């Protein structure tokens, strides 16, 4: 069963950590780039009070979930990681939604539900992870783009 502990070689663990770190760096860099570009177009400051509050609201659940996932990864509980990343990402979106678009809250709740569903059906965790982080992000982006035209 996927809930069992999986022995991961030090090389395998290093590869997983490098992939995770690379993904994190690319995500943060692209978020900063696109946010900076948008704020520059609007003649606004990138780090105003609202953006600082949003950042803190997002980072508390994200860092908590990231640290928990690292602990579970080192202990060999790999199967639970995709659902947990969905859940903590959803919690971060819900927590940060009071500082941004109202649709963010709904996306967060959907991510949490997908994560909880993935915990129940752990063998489909990676597929549900791809659905939550891939398909749902695209759908959300299309909805926001249509609702808030530039």
Specify the residue positions occupied by each region the protein language model found.
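Membrane-interface elements of multi-pass transporters and channels
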Residues: 37-41, 74-78, 146, 150
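Membrane-embedded alpha-helical transmembrane segments of multi-pass integral membrane proteins
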Residues: 26-30, 64, 68, 89-92, ...
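Terminal transmembrane helical module of multi-pass membrane proteins
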Residues: 92-150
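Selected alpha-helical membrane-embedding segments in polytopic membrane proteins
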Residues: 1-66, 70
């Amino acid at each position: 069963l996927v809930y069992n502990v999986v022995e991961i070689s030090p090389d395998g663990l290093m590869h997983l950590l490098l992939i995770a770190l690379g993904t994190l760096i690319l995500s943060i860099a692209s978020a900063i780039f696109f946010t900076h570009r948008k704020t520059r177009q609007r003649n606004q400051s990138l780090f105003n009070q609202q953006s600082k509050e949003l950042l803190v609201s997002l980072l508390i659940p994200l860092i908590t979930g990231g640290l928990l996932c690292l602990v579970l990864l080192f202990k060999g509980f790999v199967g639970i990681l995709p659902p947990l990343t969905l859940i903590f990402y959803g919690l971060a979106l819900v927590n940060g939604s009071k500082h941004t678009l109202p649709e963010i809250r709904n996306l967060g709740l959907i991510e949490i539900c997908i994560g909880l569903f993935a915990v129940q059906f752990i063998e489909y965790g990676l597929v549900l992870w791809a659905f939550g982080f891939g398909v749902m992000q695209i759908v959300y982006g299309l909805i926001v783009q249509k609702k808030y035209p530039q």
